[in-house]
């Protein structure tokens, strides 16, 4: 059942990278309030 774990890890990493790029492209929220 190692294939399942590897697939999950790969999908998770890809998803995180995709989300990061997607949220980085449209800078609508100003970064002046800290968090």
Swiss-Prot record:
This is Photosystem II reaction center protein T. Keywords: Chloroplast, Membrane, Photosynthesis, Photosystem II, Plastid, Thylakoid, Transmembrane, Transmembrane helix. One of its GO terms (biological process) is photosynthesis. It comes from Thuja plicata (Western red-cedar). It is a single-pass membrane protein. The chain crosses the membrane at residues 3-23. Found at the monomer-monomer interface of the photosystem II (PS II) dimer, plays a role in assembly and dimerization of PSII. PSII is a light-driven water plastoquinone oxidoreductase, using light energy to abstract electrons from H(2)O, generating a proton gradient subsequently used for ATP formation. Belongs to the PsbT family. The gene is psbT. GO terms for cellular component: chloroplast thylakoid membrane; photosystem II reaction center. It is found in: Plastid, Chloroplast thylakoid membrane. PSII is composed of 1 copy each of membrane proteins PsbA, PsbB, PsbC, PsbD, PsbE, PsbF, PsbH, PsbI, PsbJ, PsbK, PsbL, PsbM, PsbT, PsbY, PsbZ, Psb30/Ycf12, at least 3 peripheral proteins of the oxygen-evolving complex and a large number of cofactors. It forms dimeric complexes. Its main location: plastid.
């Amino acid at each position: 059942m190692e294939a399942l774990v590897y697939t999950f890890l790969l999908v998770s990493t890809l998803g995180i990278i995709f989300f990061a790029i997607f949220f980085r492209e449209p800078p609508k929220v100003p970064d002046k309030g800290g968090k």
